[in-house]
Amino acid sequence: MTVLIAFDGSDDSKTAIEYAARHLKPEPIVILSVWEPLLAQLTWAPLAAGVPVTAEQGDDGKFEEEKQAEALASKGAELARAAGAAEATPRAERGGGPVWAAIVDVAEEVNASLVVTGSRGLAGARSMILGSVSTRVLHHAGRPVLVVPPPKEND
């Protein structure tokens, strides 16, 4: 049973990793962090007038955002192992569109038997009950999805 866990570094995504590793005991786990180059991100963000923006790849051919996503996925895999997962593989994936679509695509690629997300992530616009990414994954994955809520304040 392969379990795909979406991880963006938010507290809710950390809770999702810890819950899955402790309660599901899946093997293997794939920890996914989705990234996109800065220029792609800026296509939907307002730009300050007159400020040139360039996206440069480093000497290793990687964008800074890709390196950050790889480090984030590795951190998520460490969290999963610390919570009891025997096998957790980090994966950084370049998003070519919405984050939820990349999660759904990777779930299909790895034939995940379950996709796990936190209820909310780091996205700026959030719905009142579930974050937009978790809601879209839930509706488009075509496979079981576990949305882990944040811990209660008094836990």
How would you describe each model-predicted region?
Residues M1-G58, A83, E87-T89:
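Small/aliphatic-rich secondary-structure junction motif
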Residues S13-A16, A20, A69, A107, ...:
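Small-residue (primarily alanine) positions within well-ordered alpha-helices
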Residues L47-G50, V106-E109, V133-S134:
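Short, hinge-like loop/turn segments at secondary-structure boundaries
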Residues P52-A71:
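A short acidic, glycine-rich active-site loop
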Residues A71, K75-V115, E153-D155:
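Structural beta-alpha unit
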Residues W100, L114-R136, H140, P150, ...:
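Glycine-rich, Arg-bearing micro-motifs that act as flexible, cationic patches
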